[in-house]
Amino acid sequence: MPHSQISPAEGSRRILEEYHIDEDVGFALPHPLEELPDTYRPWILVARNLPKLIENGKLREEVEKLPTLRTEELRGHRLQRLAHLALGYITMAYVWNRGDDDIRKVLPRNLAVPYCELSEKLGLPPILSYADCVLANWKKKDPNGPMTYENMDILFSFPGGDCDKGFFLVSLMVEIAASPAIKAIPTVSSAVEHQDPKALEKALCSIAASLEKAKEIFKRMRDFVDPDTFFHVLRIYLSGWKGNPKLPEGLLYEGVWDTPKKFSGGSAGQSSIFQSLDVLLGIKHDVGEGSAAEFLQEMREYMPPAHRNFLSSLESAPPVREFVILRRNEDLKEAYNECVNGLVSLRMFHLSIVDTYIVKPSKQKPMGGHKSEEPSNTENRGTGGTDVMNFLRSVKDTTKKALLSWP
């Protein structure tokens, strides 16, 4: 990160502006739009009616009737993000439909061409990612009201009642709760650069406090998301076509590529904030083919480019961990370890969430039907295509190893 002689407050302002990080909602898109220009009204109408169209067996017919639209009229980042979100929802619904074995391997030209055009403009993949369904998929019911679950809603929905509302909004609120940590980063960098252990200790304590708040909000997932509905309904619509035996070759985007392409579904690994803190604290995950580090690096391609650039800038920042080790200051070590323990605690809780929402339901019969005939190793994969329990254990264990101690 650039570290000239500027105040932490000015440094924070510059970072927020340069890397598209909002003062209030962090990496989330501030004030997402809800409407597209009239030309694109057909997309919005389909995206807003997905559950009903799927239930009536009309979804694919309606998608195939959509006009082939170009994207030139979609000017401005927030307008493009709304269109990308809508097309992402439609794409997932078209591919998975009722969530059974009736899967489409080809995305029709009238959807694939504009979707890929928008994806190229935004620097995002043509699949519903975390940047879409969590970071850009929200609104306040009362615009002047608070940023609380009760005053918020999502813009589009899949089948499964309010399951996706709970899943996406709690994930968003975790992001927002943890976002003050980003504001502390300029102070962290400045403190290391200027050899100021007291300033660094204070900044690290503020990061630890934001992680504690994020975990408390994460616990609300159990209040709003039903495990059976998540596993047997919502999880299917969030699944990608990489590492997925249902689409082993990937998805063909008609009119764009001549061969199928593989993309991962939305994953918490695509969250910029927790990868940012790993980099800031010098936490190194296991490397090698199929490793946690490889997966997390790949997930950066699913982040908005400005957020990817922010992560890259952190990698060239003054090394916090090395500074703490060299100072041998007990208070500084404790503040650093509080941050690491905050990440460990969040990742341990994430493991318990995965056990509740993926592992246990995979061993039970669904609400109104037979248990899936997919093998359990498939059922236990996350929407990003990983063996989610092994991945999270690896990330949690390597985070824990970053704790500092000395005689």
UniProtKB/Swiss-Prot annotation:
GO cellular component terms, A-Z: cytoplasm; cytosol; smooth muscle contractile fiber; stereocilium bundle
UniProt entry keywords in alphabetical sequence: Cytoplasm, Dioxygenase, Heme, Immunity, Iron, Metal-binding, Oxidoreductase, Tryptophan catabolism
GO BP: 'de novo' NAD biosynthetic process from L-tryptophan; inflammatory response; kynurenic acid biosynthetic process; L-tryptophan catabolic process to kynurenine; multicellular organismal response to stress; negative regulation of activated T cell proliferation; negative regulation of interleukin-10 production; negative regulation of T cell apoptotic process
GO MF annotation list: amino acid binding; heme binding; indoleamine 2,3-dioxygenase activity; metal ion binding; oxygen binding; tryptophan 2,3-dioxygenase activity
Any matching Pfam family: IDO
Disulfide bonds: none
The protein's role, per its UniProt record: Catalyzes the first and rate limiting step of the catabolism of the essential amino acid tryptophan along the kynurenine pathway. Involved in the peripheral immune tolerance, contributing to maintain homeostasis by preventing autoimmunity or immunopathology that would result from uncontrolled and overreacting immune responses. Tryptophan shortage inhibits T lymphocytes division and accumulation of tryptophan catabolites induces T-cell apoptosis and differentiation of regulatory T-cells. Acts as a suppressor of anti-tumor immunity.
Entry protein name: Indoleamine 2,3-dioxygenase 1
Organism: Rattus norvegicus (Rat)
Lineage, broadest ranks: Eukaryota, Metazoa, Chordata, Craniata, Vertebrata
